[in-house]
Amino acid sequence: MTTVSSDRIRIKLKAYDYRILDKAVAEIVDTARNTGAGVAGPIPLPTNIHKYTVNRSVHVDKKSREQFEMRIHKRLMDILEPTQQTVDALGKLSLPAGVDVEIKL
């Protein structure tokens, strides 16, 4: 087995829905383990919460407000000692829509 130039591949995943994020992480872990690479993680990172407060009406009733929030869930994982087969399998992997993936070699 030939190894890739780096010792690890760091993958950072972001999504609004944690269930979709966990499915994507499970697919990546299964793919990496099936090709003989080690996996460290997934490590749950702190969730970013963006809160927005708006008036319910246009003119009056300043006391009547509505709050919305947007949560961004994140996971971090390392693939240790990846082979060329691991990199090829990860490139062909189709993840669910709504998952943002950042890969650092």
UniProtKB/Swiss-Prot annotation:
Q: Which Gene3D superfamilies does this chain map to?
A: Ribosomal protein S10 domain (3.30.70.600)
Q: Which GO terms describe its cellular component?
A: ribonucleoprotein complex; ribosome
| Keyword hit for Hydrolase | no
Report disulfide bridges, numbered on this chain: none
Q: Which residues form the signal peptide?
A: none
State how it assembles.
Answer: Part of the 30S ribosomal subunit.
Query: What is the name attached to this protein's record?
Result: Small ribosomal subunit protein uS10
- Species whose genome carries this gene: Nitratidesulfovibrio vulgaris (strain DSM 19637 / Miyazaki F)
